[in-house]
Structures are given as structure tokens and as C-alpha cells.
């Protein structure tokens, strides 16, 4: 009955975000090579049901807000075997110039790739 440690869900949110970037054709490595980073400024996680070490889980991600400087994602972790919602969450991140640490506007070449995926809350 080993319950999944609560911190793992935040790591899974990150993995889902990285995969989302990749799926829309934006590589975080390319962003970094262009001098940008995407730090997360705020994280929320509401735990609804426990998950266990042998559970197969699915992380569902939605991009719910997008400006050229900020992105907000909502998450839902579910156990597909019984359709149990394990947790929900939210992250807010901002585009930052890695050289200065200052908030910066995302170049249009990246921004236009994300816009079609913004969903209303």
C-alpha cells in the first residue's frame, strides 16, 4: 500500500509541460540556446485521491492562458483503470532572458506555435 509521495505530482506536471512544448514543435533546448528560460513562478496541486506505486497514471494538460511573457497550465492526473481523478493542478511560468534574469517577451516564432492550443477555462 505504498502511496505515491505528493512531490511526484509536481514532477509529472513538468514532464507533461516538456512533452507539450515538444508536441507543438518547440524544443526547450532551442529556447535555451536562443537565450530564454521558462521558470515556474507558481504551482498549485489539489490532492483528491491517493495513487500507489504500481498504478498507471495519465497526466492531462491544458494551456489556459498565454501571453508573450506568461503561460498558465492546468493539469489533471487520473488513473485510467478506474477513471479516478487523483489530483488537479496549475502552474504559471514566465519567459525570461537567461543572461539577465528579466522577464522577456517570447519571440513570435515560438508564440505562434502555442496560440492554437490555448483553451478557455
Region spans (language model):
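HotDog/MaoC-like acyl-thioester-processing domains
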Residues: 52-53, 63-121
Amino acid at each position: 500500500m505504498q502511496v505515491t509521495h505528493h512531490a511526484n505530482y509536481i514532477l509529472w506536471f513538468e514532464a507533461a509541460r516538456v512533452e507539450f512544448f515538444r508536441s507543438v514543435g518547440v524544443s526547450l533546448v532551442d529556447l535555451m540556446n536562443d537565450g530564454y528560460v521558462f521558470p515556474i513562478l507558481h504551482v498549485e496541486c489539489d490532492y483528491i485521491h491517493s495513487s500507489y506505486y504500481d498504478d498507471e497514471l495519465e497526466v492531462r494538460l491544458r494551456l489556459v492562458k498565454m501571453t508573450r511573457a506568461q503561460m498558465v497550465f492546468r493539469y489533471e492526473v487520473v488513473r485510467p483503470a478506474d477513471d479516478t481523478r487523483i489530483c488537479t493542478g496549475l502552474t504559471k511560468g514566465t519567459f525570461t532572458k537567461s543572461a539577465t534574469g528579466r522577464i522577456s517577451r517570447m519571440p513570435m516564432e515560438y508564440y505562434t506555435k502555442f496560440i492554437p492550443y490555448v483553451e478557455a477555462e
